[in-house]
């Protein structure tokens, strides 16, 4: 499995970074398609460092920029083999099927059995502009698909059948997570946010 360059952030650096608020369901930023990154700036590098710190603090294994209010096509991850960052990611191929229980930091405390391809080929670039090409299966493949969903404004609820979605909405309503959150700026939004469906 190839690893992205500069996606490995030393623990000493991560300790100095800050956590960022994770947006939750009901926030329009989660339903907005993220725009391509055209230039890797110092601010973008700092964002990814803060995203990694936030992800570890949550705790989670992946975090997409829209989950912290930034509408750019970038995500961070660490499924146990060290942190990574992928800019402008896309899946170029997939194979097989795998049902697995999946949760989301933007829908805290809830999980569902979700069917996804078992294997994917993820491509993109790292923070140095080097090509990233990762053949992943099972958990890493699921992680990459989940984060790409966030970059496209797709949530786990969109993978549920109608009855599951109704039950999920009832549960979310009971947990008071489905209420719209206070409006916060959407950084780099490419189009107006669509309402949560």
Locations of regions flagged by a protein language model:
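Positively charged
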Residues: 2-197
């Amino acid at each position: 499995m190839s690893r992205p360059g500069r996606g490995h952030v030393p623990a000493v650096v991560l300790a100095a970074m800050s956590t960022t608020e994770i947006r939750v369901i009901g926030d329009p930023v989660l339903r907005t398609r993220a725009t391509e990154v055209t230039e890797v700036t110092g601010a973008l590098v700092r964002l990814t460092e803060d995203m990694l710190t936030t992800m570890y603090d949550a705790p989670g294994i992946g975090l997409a920029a829209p989950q912290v209010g930034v509408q750019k096509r970038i995500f961070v991850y660490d499924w146990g083999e060290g942190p990574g960052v992928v800019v402008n990611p896309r899946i170029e191929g997939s194979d097989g099927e795998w049902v697995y229980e999946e949760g989301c930091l933007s829908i805290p405390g809830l999980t569902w059995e979700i069917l996804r391809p078992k294997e994917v080929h993820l491509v993109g670039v790292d923070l140095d502009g080097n090509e990233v090409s990762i053949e992943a299966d099972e958990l890493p493949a699921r992680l990459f698909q989940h984060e790409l969903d966030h970059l496209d404004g797709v949530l786990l609820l969109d993978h549920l059948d109608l009855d599951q979605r109704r039950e999920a909405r009832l549960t979310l309503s009971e947990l008071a997570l489905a209420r719209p959150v206070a409006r916060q700026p959407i950084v780099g939004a490419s189009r107006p946010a669509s309402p949560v469906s």
